[in-house]
Amino acid sequence: MKKKTVSMFMGLVLGVTTVFSSIGPAVVTVSAAESGVTDSKCKKTGTPEPAADDVVPDANQYKYQKDELAAFCHFGPNTFNEIEWGEHYGNKKPSEIFKLDQKFDADTMVRTLKEAGFKKLIITAKHHDGFCIWPSKWTDYDTEEAGYEGDILAEISAACSTYDMDMGLYLSPWDIHEPSYGYKDANGNPTTPEKDVLDYNVYYNNQLEEILGNKKYGNKGRFVEVWMDGAKGSGANAQEYDFKKWFATIQKYQGKEVAGNSADCMLFGAQAYTTVRWIGNEDGVAFEDTWAKSNVNYDKNTIDSNGSTPYSKGYENGNKWTVPECDGRITSGWFWGTQKKTPKTITQLANMYFDSVGHNATMLLNVPPNNQGTVDQPILKRIEEFGQNVEDTFRTNLAKEEGTTIEASNVRGNDTAFKPGNVVDAKDETYWTTDDGTKEGSLTIKWDKAKKFDVVSIEEAIQKGQRINSYKVEYKASDDAQWQTLKNGKTVGAKRLVRTAPVSATQVKITVGTSNGKVPMLSEVGVYKASEGFQLAGAAPEGMDTTSVNNTTDFKFNKKWNPETGSQYINGQNTWSDTKDATLTYTFQGTKVYLMGTKDPGHGEADVYIDDKFVKTINTHADARTTGTVIFESDDLEAGTHTLKLVVKSKAIGVEAAYVINNGGVGMIELENSEYTMNEEDTLTVKVKRVGGTKGTITAKIQPNPGSAIQDDFDTENAPTVTLKDGESEVTVQNAAITRRNTNLTGDRAFSIELTDKNPDNAIIGFNGSARITIKDKDAINRDKLQTLVVQSAELKENLYSEGWDTFASALENARAVAENEEATEATIRNAYIALENAKKALVAREKYTDTDRFKFPWKKGTSATLEAEFATTITEACGATKWRCEIGTEGWASNGKFINSMNKTNTGTDKVEYAYNAAKTGTYHVVATYRSGDDK
């Protein structure tokens, strides 16, 4: 047993080259153009740079957003106990919950991540269970006491130093095990902060110093990010954190004052001091239009990142740069477990990458070591595969190939410093921009022959700030064709990735716009053909046979059908006809067919036949246009060759592809619905359906995955097995999901369940392979609840409180304004509620007037003040009464529930009640006194 005692990062200059950009100078032919400005039309003119925004990233934030990829490593007792949160270890010894009997393999994990393009590794040195994966002198709840002979944090640090991998430290503030957590007296009973015997804030700070001040930890002693997870289990709120003290300690050892550091250590979960923010979910995805700015209030130590389930969207006009960080998992859980060790598919990881990095955020992917201290080979291989797909996708920038011309609608001062060619020079510090007074500009990339691509990358010069609030990407199939919109939206930021079905074009145009007074600036632009693994997947579930409508071997047409292409269609292909009796046939092998196409306000009906037998009339009319959707689904068919025939009846019919179940009658399983709603402390019953055949037995698991809902909101270990026996087409699953009671004010949260681990291998998991579950917050803060609190708070009276009124009044005024603002966001409403509730709790009830807290006479015209009698500075009982003493009494009829009872004047003396007061002005004051008397006179 050890005796308890109480008592960095590398600064990098701006302009780091993007990880996977092509190396070497751009090979761009800057030929003459009919319109626009090319490099050849620019010269050195000494034009000043445009002004930077007030809010820009510091060097560490800039590097992180350019690095793009970081990894998380969750490892600890939970790894050995098949759980996510160590809430129930109780008094078990460290050796009972942590059983690593061989050396931790840090080298393989770090090397694999580095080779796959990851630039940072964040380590859970201490999770919520309080167990430390290093031998800490401040606790005996660590690896040393568990019998592990090494120092896992030091071993990972050594590997990161070898491979030059940035490091982040995860040190959970919430500590379930530590005795000093919360407020307890000498006997261990709950008490007030003032009477707390042990100080958890000191304990946590000591551990920060122990790690951050020791050169054996970190990448050569440096940490670039400290993660203070905001998770707090229900009932764990009786501990206020001394964040300011902790922040000072972090920067003392790892901040910009340390030699070699150009910026402070980044902080996650640090309230107003946050420099890396949670994206709002644990799915690893960001909002489509994400801003890298939040609004912080240092006086109140609050942050508002425009949170609206399941995203923190940021603000265009935020006052602080906060890197949007998307934390997600390569498996279903954060910690490894025998039932949650299957890695996500490359398609799932691709979606995560494009929806995080491609939405102006960083991707933080958790890679969990197993109970042998190594990373499973399938997980390592998936990391390698992911890294290879990133490299393969972005290796060749078609906008840099020989024979390319890049034109700009405007170039700032026609200066070579801001020429269009800067966007393909692989240098983040250079950029293209426009003259002052312009708030929109475009770049047009032209090729001498058509190029096939499916990814367009746009990077804003964020060293000057994030300002672009509109973008559009267009293409021309040929020089004389019309412009077709590939994608449009709002934000660009560090990177905007537009991924579509493959298209061929001779020109691509990128148009960006900003607010008044600001010019657009782009540092890099790329046009790419995605690797096979990173291609935009069609709507077909994995395992189905798919046929595009341009496959003229399987699809046959008569009369007038009109082929067209576009990124909005499955595989970029569509064929339509509005000619009555126009016919198509599709021949396929399988047991069920889905015809995919377009629904539109201008589309109509068609008759469908299977094997020359009429099946039904389909109606493809819809109020809004959708592409890539199911327009026909057959019944289950006998395994074999079949022919589908479609005959146009009225208006237009658009067809894109056919999907077929063709696995010998084993079939496809899926959840009945794609969305469910649950209450807290609830269980969910779902139906799993089987189509396309019922031959043999199919088993699968229903696996829960965190989203904006985290482990305290639902049972992460609940993963029931689904079994559909031979001939069975439907099964009901009880307890498919189980929610918990979370007494924290969280708002509605969401997680998902998905069908995984199917058996046999040729079984198909269908369109509804996963479902989103919304948990309704029993304690949710909404506008009505805020309004109720405002009304209740408005009834409080200033004269009843000696401290905290000014803060309370300010919070009340702000809450009232927010409640009346119809455009107030969910986050703004929540913050206003919490601020008012906290200010209300902080009010100190007045006991009496004193020399330092005097009653103030109202001297301004039209004002008044109430003096409660029971707030007497002194009460002198001079009459010697035994029954009717002059003292404070309590009755319901009295204002504030109290009054001065029995003031008497007798031969022996006169009772006196005195008040400390202050009269700022000399004059006559009018007093109305309320009293009662026991004397009839």
Regions found by a protein language model. Give the residues of each.
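Mature catalytic domains of secreted/periplasmic carbohydrate-active enzymes
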Residues: 36-427, 431-437, 444, 457-459, ...
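Aromatic, loop-rich ligand-recognition surfaces of beta-strand-rich domains
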Residues: 393, 425-536, 583-587, 596, ...
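Edge beta-strands of jelly-roll/beta-sandwich modules across compartments, strongly enriched
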Residues: 517-530, 651-661, 698-700, 749-751
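Sec-dependent signal peptide cleavage junction
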Residues: 19-35
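Beta-rich interaction/scaffold domains
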Residues: 779-858
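Glycan-recognition surfaces in beta-rich domains, encompassing non-catalytic CBMs
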Residues: 532-665, 858-914, 920, 933
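Short, surface-exposed beta-strand/strand-loop-strand elements in extracellular ectodomains
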Residues: 466-478, 601-614, 937
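Short boundary segments that mark the start of a structured unit
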Residues: 665-781
